[in-house]
């Protein structure tokens, strides 16, 4: 498991067992973004567990490729909306983020009156 923290709008910190990962998004243009990923390991792992480091980074990159596909598909959808003069600002982009919307609705319902509705 991991603990994720997003420092809106462009930095994500992911804390996994034995590694801290920082992803920073840099807009390069209206249709291009660079994702700089940095990995931080405890000294003993960085020095003596090279196979672990390589396996962990390979697993991370496999997930990053999936995330990249989602981003590219969402970008293509935004371009299609623009081309037909439509504007859907979100915050969720269906169908790719429907799960996130359902999760937030479920979570808000569990919080009840502790969180103001807006």
Name each model feature, range by range.
Residues 1-118:
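C-terminal catalytic domain of Rieske-type non-heme iron oxygenases
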């Amino acid at each position: 498991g991991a603990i994720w923290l997003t420092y809106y709008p462009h930095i994500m910190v992911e804390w996994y067992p034995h590694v801290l990962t920082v992803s920073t998004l840099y807009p390069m243009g209206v249709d291009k973004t660079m994702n700089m990923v940095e990995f931080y390991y405890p000294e003993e792992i960085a020095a003596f567990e090279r196979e672990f480091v390589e396996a962990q980074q390979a697993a991370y990159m496999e997930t990053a490729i999936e995330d990249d596909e989602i981003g590219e598909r969402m970008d293509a959808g935004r371009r299609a909306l623009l081309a037909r003069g439509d504007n859907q600002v979100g915050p969720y982009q269906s169908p790719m983020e429907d799960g996130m919307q359902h999760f937030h609705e479920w979570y808000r319902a569990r919080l009840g009156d502790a969180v103001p509705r807006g």
